[in-house]
Design a protein with these regions (language model features):
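Short, solvent-exposed loop/turn segments at the edges of extracellular beta-sandwich modules
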Residues: 442-448
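Aromatic/hydrophobic beta-strand junction motif of beta-rich domains
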Residues: 377-385
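Substrate-binding cleft and catalytic face of glycoside hydrolase catalytic domains
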Residues: 22-168, 205, 310
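Glycine-centered tight-turn motifs at strand-turn-strand junctions
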Residues: 401-432
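Aromatic-rich peripheral "rim/lid" segments of glycoside hydrolase catalytic domains that contact
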Residues: 41, 109, 113-114, 120-125, ...
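Boundary/entry segment of secreted carbohydrate-active catalytic domains
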Residues: 1-35
Length: 463
């Protein structure tokens, strides 16, 4: 449990006061940003300040994590030699600070703000493959310096629209990004892992959302971590890269709910709010609930609140446990109390996860009529899934517990969370007993299937 916050890098005391606040709350991990700039590929930004900070953090029992994003969205893709120079910089950073053992490669590569291009001219997502190549090179470079270094991949945003034509934000959803990452890994023929942990940023869809609201597929929030685990299993099963069933872990290295400024602290802020924030009371309940919820999630290594203290400009970020004026929010006391009461220990049932072999949310609404005259020539039913899928459907002769011969057929695809009418070619059926049946296959893994069959219905002779 900790924070992602670069504020201690700007302090004159090596972060001592900042870390004292963390200690008071019970937080034990800080993520610091070290930007790689291709214009100055061997310059460690804030090196002297980091050198002053590391021993202070160690004394305070604070683990340091380096997040190493490229300076610009095209810093990696803009030059053929950039991935190699970035990996060399990681080695330089690891040798300069040998007591830091956790490195996050890049930041939100599924978002155009941090990685471009996301799509090619044909509309195909290209960011997963480009990032896979960088991650593979970075993993090998860091392990060559010290095999015990933990390499974190992803740092994924919780949302993406998968729309190459979206104005200004043509992004890739986390599920589809992981799918593309796995496809690139398999195509590369690599025999070593890509990462030791998956980094993920499960921000809420809206700051007014409760902790357990989550997202629809293919995006994901705190309560949808199983969706990411399934995506990872679909992408990497049977490869040298661990899946969550084989011990892969996850680090939620950015999370936060932005809060409205209370009147007594208004003088410490400037500008105008650009989102609809939640209340301080709601944030406190969410943060303490988050600590308890994740305590029962054995695959999560840690949670990092994004920002211990608010930024004073309202157009920026205000999700801290501390207000801009330095006063503690209710969430400060709530998290501290939860941790002090053993909130980091699971008090309920551990959420043990196993991969699914079925299609999530696959369902069908078949006609209720059990007897139909032979003059009927229209046949259809409603199908839906919780994830993208393809289907093969038919009207079959009923043959006990098995399907008989197919007399009508239809194939197609289903978009997640959108019901579709499966309509068969117009045709009269000869008298007899029939059933509808549909077989779903998950779009991200065709070996995951589900078959649904209706109760039998009778077609009887009519004039």
């Amino acid at each position: 449990m900790g924070v992602a916050d670069d504020r201690p890098l700007g302090s004159m005391d090596g972060g001592a006061a900042f870390f004292a606040v963390m200690n008071d709350i019970g937080l034990r991990e800080v993520r610091l940003t070290v930007i790689w700039d291709p214009a100055h590929p061997t310059t460690i930004e804030n090196q002297a300040r980091i050198e002053a900070l590391v021993p202070v953090a160690t004394l305070r029992g604070i683990r340091i994590v380096f997040s190493v994003p490229p300076a610009r969205a095209r810093s990696i893709t803009g030059s053929p030699g950039a991935p190699q120079r970035y990996a060399a910089f990681l080695q330089q950073l690891a040798r300069t600070f040998p007591t830091v053992r956790d490195f996050i490669v890049g930041n939100e590569p599924n978002q155009p703000r941090f990685w471009q291009p996301q799509f090619d001219a044909r509309g195909h997502a290209v960011s997963p493959a480009a990032y896979e190549a960088l991650l593979a090179r970075s993993y090998d470079a860091l392990k060559a310096v010290d095999p015990v270094i933990t390499v974190l991949g992803g740092g994924l945003s919780p949302r993406g629209n998968d729309n190459p034509s979206a104005p200004g934000n043509n992004s890739v959803s986390p599920v589809r990004f992981i799918q593309g990452l796995g496809a690139a890994y398999r195509a590369s023929g690599r025999k070593a892992p890509l990462m030791d942990e998956l980094a993920f940023h499960p921000y809420p869809r809206k700051d007014t959302d409760g902790l357990k609201v989550g997202y629809q597929w293919p995006n994901a929030g705190v309560t949808n971590l199983g969706r990411l685990k399934q995506a990872f299993w679909d992408a990497f099963r049977g490869t040298p890269q661990k899946t969550f069933e084989r011990g892969l872990r996850m680090r939620l290295d950015e999370i936060g709910w932005q809060v409205a400024v209370v009147p007594q602290a208004r003088g410490s802020y400037s500008g105008a709010e650009n989102i609809r924030p939640t209340t301080e009371a709601a944030q406190a309940a969410i943060y303490s609930g988050l600590v308890r919820y994740i305590a029962c999630e054995p695959s999560v290594d840690s949670i990092l609140f994004f920002g211990l203290q608010d930024e004073p400009v309202l157009e920026r970020w205000q999700a801290g446990l501390v207000r801009a004026d330095g006063s503690p929010r209710p969430s400060y006391r709530a998290v501290r109390a939860t941790l002090a009461r053993g909130g980091g220990d699971c008090r309920g049932r551990m959420r043990r996860w196993r991969h699914s072999s079925k299609v999530d949310g696959a369902g069908a609404v078949f006609p209720r009529s059990r007897r139909l005259p032979s003059r009927v020539d229209s046949w259809s039913f409603l199908a839906s899934t919780g994830e993208d899928a393809v289907f093969e459907a038919g009207v079959y002769r009923a043959a006990g517990s098995r399907l008989g011969s197919r007399v009508l057929g239809e194939t197609g695809r289903l978009d997640a969370n959108l019901a579709r009418v499966v309509r068969f070619p117009s045709r009269r059926l000869s008298p007899g007993r029939y059933v509808y049946s549909i077989r779903f296959r998950a779009a991200t893994n065709k070996t995951r299937t589900r078959q649904l069959t209706s109760r039998p219905f009778v077609v009887f002779h009519s004039r």
